[in-house]
Amino acid sequence: MPEDVLFVCKGPGMNIWDDDWGTQVEDWSGGGGLAKGLVPSGPQLGATLYELERGNFMVFHFHHGSEELLVVLRGRPTLRTLDGERQLDEGEAVHFPAGPAGAHEIRNDTDETVRYLVAGIRVSPEIVEYPDLKKATGQSKHGLFFIHDVEEDA
């Protein structure tokens, strides 16, 4: 193996068009929908595949340490940001910077299933804020995960 290769992915790949969801990530926020982490992923870069039926959503949130790239694979989800709402098209890609400016929600207001991929750098530890829920999560690559209530500004 060449010396400049730091990480070699071993094991099966994943087909983003496959309808077999296998093990799913639990949604604690109430938005519903399906999520699964993608294999392969590296020590720094990761991705998650999401699927939303009508009425499901990925709750409004932003990451303090990492930026994200969303690519719509199927359907026409509604994107909510600090600038308002708009419908995304299949194949459209949207970047969300780290911090409050990157706050976003993805929602399915249509009768068609929505599928999208979110990729980003894995920052550890990471804090994610959910302004509508007045909560924040803390997480690390070592298995730490907690949900914390965020108090109103005085």
What would you call each of these model-derived segments?
Residues 69, 76-78, 85, 103, ...:
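Structural motif
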Residues 33, 48-63, 97, 101:
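Conserved short histidine dyad/triad with adjacent acidic residue
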Residues 82-99:
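Short acidic-glycine-tyrosine-enriched beta hairpin
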Residues 1-44, 127-154:
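A short, N-terminal "cap"/entry segment at the start of jelly-roll beta-barrel domains
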Residues 37-39, 58-63, 105-108:
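Short histidine-centered beta-strand/loop micro-motifs
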Residues 98-126:
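Ligand-binding loop in jelly-roll beta-barrel domains
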Residues 49-53, 62-81, 119-123:
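Short, conserved beta-strand element in jelly-roll/cupin
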